């Protein structure tokens, strides 16, 4: 999976940026805070979170790993998806979120449009233990860095994507390993498509 993009900002929208990498334009969704720091024509390095679904592949970009980690943490809360996670990160920095959760300050989250009292309470309750462990060099940060590491063999993210598409974890692991053994240079897109095609042909 794509873990990082380095390129020139070609264009920006309300919730996305197009990064030109060697003539290829990647549409990357980002928080308002991140977009506000980008300027067209300038070069940047963005850390990327890739979400794969049967109908699309979405890229989410971050200028620092801390924001990427909190993007994933927020999605661990029941009721928060990618769009809401970015919306919250457009209003609050990771440090703001950490302080609010540790202080059990629900009002910080309730002040964000679209976040009601129940969701604010869930954010505090469900992130309390996780956020408390986050600090520079903590085990959580190290684990998060490893999860999205790009390897030439089956990555956890590819397997997770196939599980989201209906595979059991065992099926996904076997499918990915088998395809890569036959074609080590296969692209991620083709890997997923081939796995889906092979599975459908077996039914």
UniProtKB/Swiss-Prot annotation:
CDD domains: UBA_RuvA_C (cd14332). Keywords: Cytoplasm, DNA damage, DNA recombination, DNA repair, DNA-binding. The RuvA-RuvB-RuvC complex processes Holliday junction (HJ) DNA during genetic recombination and DNA repair, while the RuvA-RuvB complex plays an important role in the rescue of blocked DNA replication forks via replication fork reversal (RFR). RuvA specifically binds to HJ cruciform DNA, conferring on it an open structure. The RuvB hexamer acts as an ATP-dependent pump, pulling dsDNA into and through the RuvAB complex. HJ branch migration allows RuvC to scan DNA until it finds its consensus sequence, where it cleaves and resolves the cruciform DNA. GO terms for biological process: DNA recombination; DNA repair. Pfam families: HHH_5 (PF14520), RuvA_C (PF07499), RuvA_N (PF01330). The gene is ruvA. Belongs to the RuvA family. Residues 150-203 are annotated as: Domain III. Transmembrane segments: none annotated. This is Holliday junction branch migration complex subunit RuvA. Has three domains with a flexible linker between the domains II and III and assumes an 'L' shape. Domain III is highly mobile and contacts RuvB. One of its GO terms (cellular component) is Holliday junction resolvase complex. Residues 143-149 are annotated as: Flexible linker. Signal peptide: none annotated. GO terms for molecular function: ATP binding; four-way junction DNA binding; four-way junction helicase activity. InterPro entries: DNA_helicase_Holl-junc_RuvA_I, NA-bd_OB-fold, RuvA, RuvA_2-like, RuvA_C, RuvA_C_sf.
